[in-house]
């Protein structure tokens, strides 16, 4: 018991010294590489009737959207998070891949000092610049720890409201009422796949952060913890840091995004909703004309 207590004390001392040294660095900067992966059950999208070979082919085509590599460049107050251009795959042809490629996310800038968020976003060929306030999650910090690479990480949990157009949490409606209605075939039904989609209102976020890197930054929209966030588990998506370089010899300037029509997140969501309504009317009209 004494040995364990001494080890715990030494760990705290090491973390404190690391925090003190880095937090007093004048031009502290870092670079983190993150791998993201989103799982998708094709059974939720009519995949139960597909052969195993068909499922494999579709998942291979979807891989460029479900698995990505991102780079986070950060300092004490700012960060820029963007997809690794060397590994970014071109959008695929039709189907879900073609639809998903219509939502192209650009660099995301966070300024924790000014509570500012900026992100370049392209939607059906039109470029937008989303400008909004940073949304901070109500993190519940725990004493649970684990090692990620050479860093001791602590667990934090939060409940997050899901954006109504976050495709990573989309799933097909599968209520008991719907199952009951499936027995009654309606030949006049023109409901589209989009109308069959639902998104949960909230999801649980589990984050692992390290006080050894004392910046309250993290991948994507995640931030606000007393240390860099190295791992995030959000519903069907996992984000994991695979490499960190602190104070690199060749520093990369954090450039604030500036391209596109300036718009708030709420206004951007309204634009998407309007476009999807147009698509529903267009495809619904085709179905009724058959």
Feature names for model-found ranges:
Residues 1-34, 288-289:
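Bacterial Sec-dependent N-terminal signal peptides
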Residues 27-290:
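Extended soluble regions of mature proteins
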């Amino acid at each position: 018991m004494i040995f364990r207590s001494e080890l715990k004390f030494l760990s705290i001392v090491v973390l404190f010294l690391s925090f003190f040294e880095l937090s007093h660095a004048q031009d502290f900067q870092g670079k983190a590489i993150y791998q993201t992966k989103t799982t998708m059950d094709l059974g939720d999208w009519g995949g139960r009737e597909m052969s195993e070979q068909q499922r494999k082919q579709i998942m291979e085509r979807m891989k460029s959207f479900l698995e990505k590599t991102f780079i986070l460049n950060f300092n004490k107050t700012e960060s820029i998070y963007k997809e690794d251009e060397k590994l970014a795959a071109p959008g695929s042809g039709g189907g879900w891949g073609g639809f998903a490629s219509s939502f192209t996310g650009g660099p995301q800038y966070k300024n924790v000092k000014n509570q500012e968020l900026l992100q370049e976003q392209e939607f059906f060929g039109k470029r937008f610049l989303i400008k909004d306030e940073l949304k901070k999650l109500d993190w519940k910090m725990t004493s649970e720890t684990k090692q990620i690479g050479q860093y001791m990480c602590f667990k934090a949990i939060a409940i997050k409201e899901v954006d109504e157009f976050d495709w990573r949490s989309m799933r097909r409606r599968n209520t008991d009422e719907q199952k009951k209605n499936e027995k009654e075939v309606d030949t006049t039904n023109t409901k589209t796949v989009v109308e069959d989609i639902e998104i949960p209102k909230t999801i649980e976020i589990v984050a692992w952060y390290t006080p050894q890197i004392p910046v309250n930054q993290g991948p994507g929209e995640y931030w606000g913890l007393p240390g860099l966030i190295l791992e995030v588990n959000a519903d069907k998506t996992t984000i994991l840091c695979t490499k960190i370089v602190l104070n690199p010899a060749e520093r990369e300037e954090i450039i604030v995004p500036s391209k596109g029509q300036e718009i708030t997140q709420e206004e951007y969501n309204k634009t998407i909703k309007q476009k999807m309504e147009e698509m529903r009317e267009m495809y619904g009209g085709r179905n009724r004309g058959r």
